[in-house]
Amino acid sequence: MKRFIFSILLLIWAAVSSAQVSLLVTNDMGRNGYYEQKPIAELMGRMAEEADFEAVLALGDVHHFMGVESVDDPLWMTNYEIIYSHPELQIPWYPILGNHEYRGNTQAVLDYAQVSRRWQMPARYYSKVFEGDSTSVRVIFLDTTPLIDKYHNDPQDYPTVRQQRADRQLAWLDKELAAAREDWIVVVGHHPIYADTPKSTEERTDMQKRVDPILRRHRVDMYVCGHIHNFQHIKPQGSPIDYVVNSAASLSRQKVGKVEGTVFVSGEPGFSILSCTRKELKLDMINARGEILHTVKRNK
């Protein structure tokens, strides 16, 4: 078994060793270490020993169920600090809010940046450029829950959503993309634009109506999200964008089908590796055994 894992790690190392920027992508993981969260976290750490990851992109629902109450909530330890304790995961984490964080104190999620050195969250939505020797990728982090009507219509379960201005975020996104000059542009959010899911259709139609036209107009390379708890790669006809659903890093939803434009699906849990050179951007989907299930590639 150890030899098998070592072989897998060598394959991952070979897959990212030539990249100038390499990032881990994880989401939907906060389950106190259960439902494979802890083993997957340990696998991420072992892979980080072999590959020079610059940061972790945490795409929401770091805390499932009711979010957190404060920066001192014990869930910070049981969902995050104790679970992702590997020395090689003590790198910057760039998070966004998921719908489950909105059931609790969202300001505490931002304020945790004052508690944890690795928790880098300057705002509810923001932009970050990662640079290699001869390439650059801009990652734009969205706060998608306020962009979806159903959360505004449920103030009892999502009490602070109505305080957020969707129009301001969308105007910011348009301006940010218009000014972007990096080699690669990746937009990340918690909710999908396209996906097969039993969740509310309204979530996707609102994202298609409000976010997708901006992304298409500026011809971004990838949109990466979580929320659905399985892996999906979708390339709808007429869109220049690769739409990626990253699986849960704990409890996944095994049943997943296809929609128009589906390239790949898997119900396994796991995480992804986003990497790039000047000529290639790719995302490797990794399962809980460390196997590469599918690779999304874009070339210049």
Residue ranges of each PLM-predicted region?
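Residue-level signal for glycine
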Residues: 290-292
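Residue-level marker for buried hydrophobic side chains located in beta-strands
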Residues: 23-25, 56-58, 95, 187, ...
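Extended active-site neighborhood of metal-dependent phosphoesterases/phosphodiesterases
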Residues: 64-185, 200-206, 210-222, 230-277, ...
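N-terminal active-site segment of His-dependent metallophosphoesterases
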Residues: 17-74, 167-168
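Hydrophobic h-region of N-terminal signal peptides that target proteins for export
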Residues: 9-18
